[in-house]
Every structure is written in structure tokens, then in C-alpha cells.
């Protein structure tokens, strides 16, 4: 395998609406991001994954795109975008664009024309049927919406304002590749591909994910756009197994650099239930089993994985699986140390590096997220008590990740001089960037050190992974390459745990505790975590 820059990269996800507001309108924007590049350079990241900034009516916070080659006015202008790319490049940071090509907005010119004129070429860019089948939208209700003008139904697996594209149409595919090349020519560093495993769907056969044409489409895309360029491409693939991940990310297959797989995230939900039926407690044995499978079965020669706990759709890791009260700092560091030394490309979501937490939502009028609001409406109709609904939204709702970035202890956490589009977490006076940078023992410096360890130990790209047999609540593994061995240990609980590991410590690389020189028969305090090099 030829080693690429992204094997050793660490990517930072920016959710633009909530990162930094430069003009006081309460919404984060591109100049705001540019103004914080020095902070991100200090963290040490290699690339920024930018959630969508394209022109959009914002029905789903920008994942409903009206024009792929224009910037939404709330985020700024194309000049602002060009400046962000250029300023990031000066700091050796690449910009990864979010590519949403499973669907568009219903306000995209293609869909407007498709509705106006049933004989237009654009009509076939979307999926129309005379009668709907029983496919459901991921955002609740039917996946089919009736269009009165033409008397047909169009398919939308997300909101009805997000009609699905018909990838069987070759002309549409060429239009998408032209748009991708427009961004590549601007100097971006790659693409994160939203729900890309859905583009091969066959709705009449109820095939939604991993349809038979998915991989041929991706190979065609690769060859028409980024294939001969040194770009990072990552596909959002909810249903992927290690075997499926190889189809996407084996360099010989000429598709993508890596995948986002979500098997570990599935442990947040009760099996066979909608996401709102969340698991009260993390099944650590299952977590170890899942990571062990991905670390050992997706080898460096035949594929590549992403490493993440958080993104814009998920609750804060320190709140759902950590302890965001008594052990907030320690549990946040434990999850970071555990993840960042595995094989794969780590992703940090904005605010994760300072230990931002879920928001204490109390009423529905505090909620902005379309998915949460649709769930609440349907649940209320079914007679589910509002207390139960709010509990689910507090724990698992997407707005938890979307509250504004907490920069300092000034009004609105320094995010905006205006009224923020979504309320700032009331804990911002204690949890903010200014506080983190001033404290040498903060979560921020743990992340900074982890980024540095990866840069200085490129052998970790290829190193073997060995899961160790430990107490149930302890996750421990060894990364090994030739004579070099790193031992990583994390106690994922609020209780003390016993640990016995054979071997002698050569040096301590990182810790959130006082790492013991002697590994045999030690007692781990709650949320203890460390990485040591073994002799």
C-alpha cells in the first residue's frame, strides 16, 4: 500500500452555523471560521471537514442544497470561501467539502424545472411514480410526496423538501461530476460524502442502501473527478461491515479513501428500535468487540476506516457515554486517548476538544432540529408523554451537537454579538476555549498531544492491533510493529477497576492520571486512561 497524507491526518469537523459568527446576525459564517484558523492550527489538525455551506433554504440545516456552486448568503460569499481555502492552505490545513448528492432541495433549479415541465430532461433527474409503495422516510412518514401539478409522487428519503436524485440518469451523473470538478479546481482537499450508500437505491424493490449499482457509480465518479488527485474522500455508510468497507476503500477498487461506519454508534440505541429508544448504559463488552472487529478485519492493505465519537448528528460523547458531571474532563480525555491511537483517521467534532456537553432541553420551543420536531409531533399524536419525548431529545437529539461553539465566558460564549440561532449551553462560563487554553491540564491539550503522537509515530498507520483480556469495564489494547509496542488503557466507568498487564513501561506518552510504572496488579481509578510505550 502506498501511504497517503490522509493515513496520518487528523480531521476537525466544523458545523458552520454554530462555529463563529463574524457579523452579529446570530449565525456562524465563513469569515468566522477563517478568524479561528490559528486556533485550529494550534490544535494541530490536518484538515477541516466543512458541513454544507452551499445555497440552501435550510430546511435541514444546509443538507438541502438549492445551488451546489453558490454559497448561502447567511455564510458569506464565494470570495469568503476562496479566502478560507487560501488562509487554511497557508497553515497547511486542507478544506474537505460536504458532498450531498443523494438528494437536492426542492428549490434547486433542476427540481423546479422537473415540476414545471414533465417533458424536461430534469424530470428524470428525480424519481417519480404514479403510485407510492410503503417505503418510509428517515425523517418520519412516507418517503413519497404527491405533486398535484403532474399527478405523480416523488421520492424523498429525508424531508419532503429533499427530493432524491435518480442516479440511473447518466446526464445527471455528469452534471454532478462537473460540479465536483468545480470545487476541486478551487483547491479543496477532498469530499465527505453524505449518505453515499443510498445513491444505488432501487425503490420499486425497496432496496435503499448498498444497491447493485452503488460501487460502479462510485468508480465512475472517482475516474471522472478526484481519482488522479491527492484528495481525501470519505463516505457516510451507516450499514457497512468491514467486508463492505473494503469495496469502498480498497485502493485497488478505485472508489474512496475511507468510510464512516457507525456500528459502534449503534450501541446508543436499543436493538431493533428507532433511535429515540436509547440505551441507558454503554455495553462496553460489545464496544470492545466492534472495535476489535474493525481494527483487525479492515487491514491497511485493503481499506481504511475513520475514527470518531461525535458529529453534527450525534449527542456529545461525554454526555451519552461519559460522565459530564463529576468526571467530565477525565471521561472526555479517556474517550480521546482510547480512540486516537487506533488504526484509522481520527475526526474531532467542534467543541469535543474542550469537552462540550449535551444541552439541558426542557421544552419543545427550545428545539430547532427537524428530525427531533418530527419525532415529537408523531410521538405526541400516539399519546407518548411530553416528559418522555423531552428525555429522548435531551439524550439523543441532534441539536446537542449544534449549540454554538463556546469560545469564552463573555455573552453568548463569544460566538456572536447578536441573538444566536440556537441557544448557547448555559455551562459556557465554565466550559470554553479561553479557559481550556489557559489550563495546561485541559482536555484541549490532551487532544493536541494525541495529534502530535500520531504525527511523530507514523508506524501506527500499519501497526497491528491486539485487544487485551481485561475487566469488563476496562478497554485495553496494544499497537505493535516490529519492536515497537504501545499499550493503551481506559477505564470506562465511574468505579475503580483492577488491571493486570504483562510488560514493563519504557515511557509514558499520554495520561489523564498518574500512569503507573508497574503494570501488574494495579487499580485504575474511575475514568483512568493512558498510553505507554512498552520495553
UniProtKB/Swiss-Prot annotation:
What are the protein's GO molecular function terms? alpha-amylase activity; glucan 1,6-alpha-glucosidase activity
What are the annotated GO cellular component locations?
cytoplasm
What biological-process terms (Gene Ontology) are attached?
oligosaccharide catabolic process
Q: List the EC numbers from the record.
A: 3.2.1.70
Catalyzed reaction equations: Hydrolysis of (1->6)-alpha-D-glucosidic linkages in (1->6)-alpha-D-glucans and derived oligosaccharides
Q: Which residues form the active site?
A: 194 (nucleophile), 236 (proton donor)
Give its localization. Cytoplasm
Annotated site residue numbers, Transition state stabilizer: 313
Protein keywords: Cytoplasm, Glycosidase, Hydrolase
Which InterPro entries does this chain map to?
Glyco_hydro_13_cat_dom (IPR006047), Glyco_hydro_b (IPR013780), Glycoside_hydrolase_SF (IPR017853), Malt_amylase-like_C (IPR032091), O16G_dom_2 (IPR045857)
Source domain of life: Bacteria
Q: Which family does it belong to?
A: Belongs to the glycosyl hydrolase 13 family.
What does it do? The physiological substrates may be short isomaltosaccharides.
Name of the protein in its database record: Glucan 1,6-alpha-glucosidase
Source organism of the structure: Streptococcus pneumoniae serotype 4 (strain ATCC BAA-334 / TIGR4)
List the lineage, top down.
Bacteria, Bacillati, Bacillota, Bacilli, Lactobacillales
Amino acid at each position: 500500500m502506498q501511504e497517503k497524507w490522509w493515513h496520518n491526518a487528523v480531521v476537525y469537523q466544523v458545523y458552520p452555523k454554530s462555529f463563529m459568527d463574524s457579523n452579529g446576525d446570530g449565525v456562524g459564517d465563513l469569515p468566522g471560521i477563517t478568524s479561528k484558523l490559528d486556533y485550529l492550527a494550534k490544535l494541530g489538525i490536518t484538515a477541516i471537514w466543512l458541513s454544507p455551506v452551499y445555497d440552501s433554504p435550510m430546511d435541514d440545516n444546509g443538507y438541502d442544497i438549492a445551488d451546489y456552486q453558490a454559497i448561502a448568503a447567511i455564510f458569506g460569499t464565494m470570495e469568503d470561501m476562496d479566502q478560507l481555502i487560501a488562509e487554511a492552505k497557508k497553515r497547511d490545513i486542507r478544506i474537505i467539502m460536504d458532498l450531498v448528492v443523494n438528494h437536492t432541495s426542492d428549490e434547486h433549479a433542476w427540481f423546479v424545472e422537473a415540476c414545471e415541465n414533465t417533458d424536461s430532461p430534469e424530470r428524470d433527474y428525480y424519481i417519480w411514480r404514479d403510485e407510492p409503495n410503503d417505503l418510509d422516510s428517515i425523517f418520519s412518514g412516507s418517503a413519497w410526496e404527491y405533486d398535484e401539478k403532474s399527478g405523480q409522487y416523488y421520492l424523498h428519503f429525508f424531508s419532503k423538501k429533499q427530493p432524491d436524485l435518480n442516479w440511473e440518469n447518466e446526464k445527471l451523473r455528469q452534471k454532478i461530476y462537473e460540479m465536483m470538478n468545480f470545487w476541486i479546481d478551487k483547491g479543496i482537499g477532498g469530499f465527505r460524502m453524505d449518505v453515499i450508500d443510498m445513491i444505488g437505491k432501487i425503490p420499486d424493490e425497496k432496496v435503499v442502501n448498498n444497491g447493485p449499482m452503488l460501487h460502479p457509480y462510485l468508480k465512475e465518479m472517482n475516474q471522472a473527478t478526484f481519482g488522479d488527485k491527492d484528495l481525501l474522500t470519505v463516505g457516510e455508510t451507516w450499514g457497512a461491515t468491514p467486508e463492505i468497507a473494503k469495496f469502498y476503500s480498497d485502493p485497488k477498487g478505485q472508489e474512496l479513501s475511507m468510510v464512516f461506519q457507525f456500528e459502534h454508534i449503534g450501541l446508543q440505541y436499543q436493538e431493533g428500535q428507532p433511535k429515540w429508544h436509547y440505551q441507558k448504559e454503554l455495553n462496553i463488552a460489545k464496544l470492545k468487540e466492534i472495535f476489535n472487529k474493525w481494527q483487525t478485519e479492515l487491514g491497511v492493505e485493503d481499506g481504511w476506516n475513520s475514527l470518531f465519537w461525535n458529529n453534527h448528528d450525534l449527542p456529545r460523547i461525554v454526555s451519552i457515554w461519559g460522565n459530564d458531571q463529576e468526571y467530565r474532563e477525565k471521561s472526555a480525555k479517556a474517550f480521546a486517548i482510547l480512540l486516537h491511537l487506533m488504526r484509522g483517521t481520527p475526526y474531532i467534532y467542534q467543541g469535543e476538544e474542550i469537552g462540550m456537553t449535551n444541552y439541558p432541553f426542557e421544552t419543545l420551543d427550545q428545539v430547532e432540529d427537524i428530525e427531533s420536531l418530527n419525532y415529537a409531533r408523531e410521538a405526541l399524536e400516539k399519546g407518548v408523554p411530553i416528559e418522555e419525548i423531552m428525555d429522548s431529545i435531551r439524550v439523543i437529539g441532534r441539536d446537542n451537537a449544534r449549540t454554538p461553539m463556546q469560545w469564552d465566558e463573555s455573552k453568548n460564549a463569544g460566538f456572536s454579538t447578536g441573538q444566536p440561532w440556537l441557544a448557547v449551553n448555559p455551562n459556557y462560563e465554565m466550559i470554553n476555549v479561553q479557559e481550556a487554553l489557559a489550563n495546561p491540564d485541559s482536555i484541549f491539550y490532551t487532544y493536541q498531544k494525541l495529534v502530535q503522537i500520531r504525527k511523530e509515530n507514523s508506524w501506527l498507520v500499519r501497526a497491528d492491533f491486539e485487544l487485551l483480556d481485561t475487566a469488563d469495564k476496562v478497554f485495553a489494547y496494544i499497537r505493535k510493529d516490529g519492536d515497537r509496542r504501545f499499550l493503551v488503557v481506559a477505564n470506562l466507568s465511574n468505579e475503580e477497576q483492577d488491571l493486570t498487564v504483562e510488560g514493563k513501561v519504557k515511557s509514558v506518552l499520554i495520561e489523564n492520571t498518574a500512569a503507573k510504572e508497574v503494570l501488574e496488579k494495579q487499580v485504575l481509578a474511575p475514568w483512568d486512561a493512558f498510553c505507554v510505550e512498552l520495553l
